[in-house]
């Protein structure tokens, strides 16, 4: 079996990219004879980390049909149309070179791989990790209905990472019978546990961007320290964005320098997360709650928004808490509740129990293999 994946990301800081890395590892472990190829947009850490498992790779920049809402204009549409022909041609050339049995686009962000596969008469599957309408950080460059129709028509199967995403796209796509849910793996191998006697610490893992909601965590911490001045917030995933600069200003303005620690993007985030007493998620939306599972696998209760992606994994008071994302005050109350509860050690054990024998690389790979070997009507 020869499989060709199309990746829109070059770094390993996104859920879709980390999913691809785990999937490539798992497939190679489960089916050593299979040949796996990936088209990356550029040479970077994702290429470096997946390379040991690949039979080949190519670097082809594929234009996106998902853009920031403020950049949805005729100029962007023109630029996409100008770039797509070259990208399709290069992708078709690579498909002819390696002759894959199946191709898989690992994102909703670009249709180039699907279009090229269709032109070369190669079966194509789409692995969708995004729901733009709900995330609101990206939007379709062209008419949403026409894009969704292309997704249906250019795919023999459409994979999604959660039951919630499956229900959403069942109501959106013209061929809902093509949809399969496959829960991805989350590999966590942290080095050490919390140091005895350290201040109560909340860990938050995620790239610094508005949808991830680091600003909400800071607003909540501002309230928490009024009651518990020693509470610490560990933010993992820092970058040099304008949003990150705004967070820095807010931390200074609120006099929280002694309470907030920032760790830049790292390929080993769990070594930091496991130092916390609990994990926090402030995302407005997640197609799959990967960061929630990461917290649970680190043995941490997780405080998450009271939304479908949180409700699917967290049971109130058992392995975490749910809160109203529109209210930093409600989040502050849940953090204080976690500090005051006498059941924190028990909740940590429950966190591990709730993901025991779940979300493993071997299971992910076998589920994926079963799906791609199945016949769609």
Report each predicted region and the residues it spans.
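A conserved mid-protein helix/loop that constitutes part of the nucleotide-sugar donor-binding site
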Residues: 14-25, 200, 207-226, 245, ...
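Glycosyltransferase donor-sugar binding loop
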Residues: 38-45, 186, 205, 232-246
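Nucleotide-sugar donor phosphate/pyrophosphate-binding loop at the beta->alpha transition
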Residues: 86-87, 123-125, 131-154
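Carbohydrate-associated surface elements
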Residues: 164, 185
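Aromatic "clamp/platform" in nucleotide-sugar-dependent glycosyltransferases that forms part
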Residues: 265, 284
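Short hydrophobic beta-strand element within catalytic cores of glycosyltransferases
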Residues: 301-305
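Conserved acidic donor-binding segment of nucleotide-sugar-dependent glycosyltransferases
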Residues: 316-317, 321-328, 337-342
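A short, well-ordered alpha-helix in the C-terminal region of glycosyltransferases
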Residues: 343-358, 367-370
């Amino acid at each position: 079996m020869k499989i060709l994946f199309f990746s829109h990301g070059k770094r390993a800081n996104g859920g879709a990219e980390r999913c691809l890395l785990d999937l490539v590892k798992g497939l190679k472990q489960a089916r050593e004879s299979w040949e796996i190829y990936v088209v990356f947009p550029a040479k970077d850490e994702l290429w470096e980390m997946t390379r040991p498992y690949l039979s080949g790779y190519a670097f082809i920049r594929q234009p996106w049909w998902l853009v920031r809402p403020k950049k949805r204009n005729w100029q962007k549409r023109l630029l996409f149309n100008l770039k797509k022909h070259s990208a399709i041609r290069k992708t078709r050339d690579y498909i002819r070179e390696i002759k894959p049995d199946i191709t898989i686009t690992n994102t909703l962000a670009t249709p180039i791989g699907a279009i090229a596969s269709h032109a070369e008469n190669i079966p194509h599957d789409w692995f969708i990790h995004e729901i733009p309408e709900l995330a609101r950080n990206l939007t379709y460059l062209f008419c949403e209905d026409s894009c969704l129709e292309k997704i249906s028509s250019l795919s023999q199967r459409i994979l999604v990472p959660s039951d919630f995403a499956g229900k959403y796209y069942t109501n959106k796509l013209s061929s809902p019978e093509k949809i399969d849910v496959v829960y991805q793996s989350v590999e966590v191998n942290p080095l050490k546990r919390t140091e005895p006697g350290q201040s109560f610490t909340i860990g938050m893992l995620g790239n610094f961007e508005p949808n991830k909601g680091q600003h909400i965590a800071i607003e909540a911490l501002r309230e928490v320290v009024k009651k518990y001045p020693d509470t610490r917030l560990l933010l993992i995933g820092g970058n040099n964005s304008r949003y990150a600069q705004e967070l820095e200003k807010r931390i200074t303005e609120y006099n929280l320098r002694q309470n907030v620690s920032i760790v830049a993007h790292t390929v080993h985030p769990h070594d930091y997360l496991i130092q916390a007493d609990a994990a926090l998620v402030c995302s407005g939306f997640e197609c799959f709650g990967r960061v929630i599972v990461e917290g649970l696998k680190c043995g941490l209760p997780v405080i998450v928004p009271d939304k479908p992606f949180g409700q699917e994994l967290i049971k109130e008071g058992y392995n975490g808490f749910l809160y109203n994302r529109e209210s930093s005050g409600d989040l502050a109350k849940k953090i204080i509740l976690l500090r005051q509860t006498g059941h924190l050690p028990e909740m940590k054990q429950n966190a591990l129990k709730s993901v025991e024998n779940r979300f493993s690389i071997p299971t992910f790979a076998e589920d994926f293999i079963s799906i791609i070997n199945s016949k769609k009507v």
